[in-house]
From Swiss-Prot:
Record organism: Bat coronavirus HKU3 (BtCoV)
Main location per the UniProt record: host cell
A Gene Ontology term for the protein's cellular component: membrane
Keyword Membrane appears in the UniProt entry: yes
Keywords: Host endoplasmic reticulum, Host Golgi apparatus, Host membrane, Membrane, Virulence
Function noted in UniProt: Could be a determinant of virus virulence. Seems to stimulate cellular DNA synthesis in vitro.
InterPro entries: NS6_bCoV
Name under which the protein is recorded: ORF6 protein
Upper lineage: Viruses, Riboviria, Orthornavirae, Pisuviricota, Pisoniviricetes
Family: Belongs to the coronaviruses accessory protein 6 family.
Misc. remarks from the entry: Bat coronavirus HKU3 is highly similar to SARS-CoV (SARS-like).
Domain of life: Viruses
Record localization: Host endoplasmic reticulum membrane; Host Golgi apparatus membrane
Length: 63
């Protein structure tokens, strides 16, 4: 019979072994993830006002 608790403990043990193997601590992992997220979203927060000037308003034709 499948025991969910045993399965969860096994996954936790595997994660601990992986973290010990790569010498990744939880606080280092948090810093790593936050820096990756900052790098991914940096292009979205960059302001390109010159591109906004080139846009033209959309014209609506009413019947």
């Amino acid at each position: 019979m499948f025991h969910l608790v045993d399965f969860q403990v096994t996954i936790a043990e595997i994660l601990i072994i992986i973290m010990k193997t790569f010498r990744v601590a939880i606080w280092n992992l948090d810093i790593l993830i936050s820096s990756i997220v900052r790098q991914l979203f940096k292009p979205l927060t960059k302001k390109n006002y010159s591109e906004l000037d080139d846009e033209e308003p959309m014209e609506l034709d009413y019947p």
